[in-house]
Regions:
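Substrate-binding pocket helix/loop in short-chain dehydrogenase/reductase
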Residues: 105-106, 110-118, 200, 211
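Alpha-helical segment proximal to the catalytic Tyr-Lys
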Residues: 134, 178-182, 239
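Conserved glycine-rich cofactor-binding loop
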Residues: 18-20
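Conserved glycine-rich Rossmann-like NAD(P)H-binding loop of the short-chain dehydrogenase/reductase
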Residues: 32-51
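C-terminal substrate-recognition "lid" of short-chain dehydrogenase/reductases
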Residues: 88, 129, 137, 141, ...
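Active-site helix of classical SDR
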Residues: 129, 165, 173
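Residue(s) in the substrate-gating loop at a strand-loop-helix junction
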Residues: 149
Length: 254
C-alpha cells in the first residue's frame, strides 16, 4: 500500500482584506494558488468584498469566500474562521491584517479611542489566532502572520494607542510561536513602515516629504511589497521561521 503524501490544497483567511495591504495579500496568495477567505468588518462592505473574491476566483482559478466579521468580537472572529473551514475543509494560513487608527496626543486622547484601537488591532488578532489555532493544531499544520508596524517597534508621537496595540501584537506572536511550534505551526509578525494606502493618502505633501526623507529607499512602500513577504511566510518553505518580527520599511528603522 502506497502512502498518500500529496500536499493538500492550502487555504487562507485574510482579515481586513477588502482594501490596502490586506487586499494585496489576498491577491498574492490567490496568485500562489491558495483558496482565500476575504474579510470586511461589516455588512456595508460585503458587496465589494464579494466582488473582489469573485475576481480572485476568475483570475486565479481558486476557491474564494467573502465574510463580514468584526474581529474585535470573539463570536464574529470564530464565525469567520469557521466559515472558511467549512467552505475549504481546512484553514492553513491566517493573516491578521485588520486594523484601525485613532491618532492623537496622549494628553488629549479619549479613552474610547484608545479602547477601539486595542480592541480591533490587538484583541481582534488574539480572537482570530485562537479560532484558527484550534483548527491548525488538529491538522498539525499552520502559518500565522500578524501585521504589526514599525510604530510597534519604535513608537511614534501621537499614536500611543496604535503603538501599544502593535507592540502587543509582537508579544502575542512570540508567545504563539513558542506554544504552537511543536504542532508544525509557525507564527511571525510583519512590521511595515509607511506604505502607500488610504491612510498615507491623507498626508499632506509636506508630511509625505518629511517621511520619505527618513526612508533610506526614498519612497513609500507598496502594498505588494508587504504581500510578497507575507506570501513567503505563509508558504511551506518558511517552516523553520517562527517568532520573528520582520520590518519592511525601506530602511527607515536603520
Amino acid at each position: 500500500m502506497t502512502e498518500n503524501t500529496e500536499t493538500p490544497r492550502r487555504s487562507a483567511v485574510v482579515t481586513g482584506s477588502s482594501r490596502g495591504i490586506g487586499r494585496a495579500v489576498a491577491e498574492e496568495l490567490a496568485r500562489a494558488g491558495f483558496d482565500v477567505c476575504v474579510n470586511c468588518s461589516s455588512e456595508r462592505g460585503l458587496d465589494e468584498a464579494r466582488a473582489f473574491a469573485a475576481a480572485l476566483e476568475a483570475d486565479h482559478g481558486v476557491r474564494t469566500l467573502a465574510v463580514a466579521a468584526n474581529v474585535a468580537d470573539a463570536a464574529e472572529a470564530e464565525g469567520l474562521v469557521a466559515a472558511a473551514h467549512e467552505s475549504f475543509g481546512r484553514v492553513d494560513v491566517l493573516v491578521n491584517n485588520a486594523g484601525i487608527t485613532r491618532d492623537g496626543l496622549l494628553a488629549r486622547m479619549k479613552e474610547e479611542d484608545f479602547d477601539a484601537v486595542i480592541d480591533v488591532n490587538l484583541k481582534g488578532t488574539f480572537n482570530c489566532c485562537k479560532a484558527a489555532a484550534q483548527r491548525m493544531m488538529k491538522q498539525r499544520y499552520g502559518r500565522i502572520v500578524n501585521l504589526s508596524s514599525v510604530v510597534g517597534v519604535a513608537g511614534n508621537a501621537g499614536q500611543a494607542n496604535y503603538a501599544a496595540s502593535k507592540a502587543g501584537v509582537i508579544g502575542l506572536t512570540k508567545s504563539l510561536a513558542r506554544e504552537l511550534a511543536a504542532r508544525n505551526i509557525t507564527a511571525n509578525a510583519v512590521a511595515p513602515g509607511f506604505i502607500a494606502t488610504d491612510m498615507t493618502d491623507a498626508l499632506s505633501e509636506k508630511q509625505r516629504e518629511a517621511i520619505v526623507g527618513r526612508i533610506a529607499s526614498k519612497r513609500l512602500g507598496d502594498p505588494e511589497d508587504v504581500a510578497k513577504l507575507v506570501r513567503f511566510l505563509a508558504s511551506e518553505e518558511a517552516g523553520y521561521i517562527t517568532g520573528q518580527v520582520i520590518c519592511i520599511d525601506g530602511g527607515m528603522s536603520l
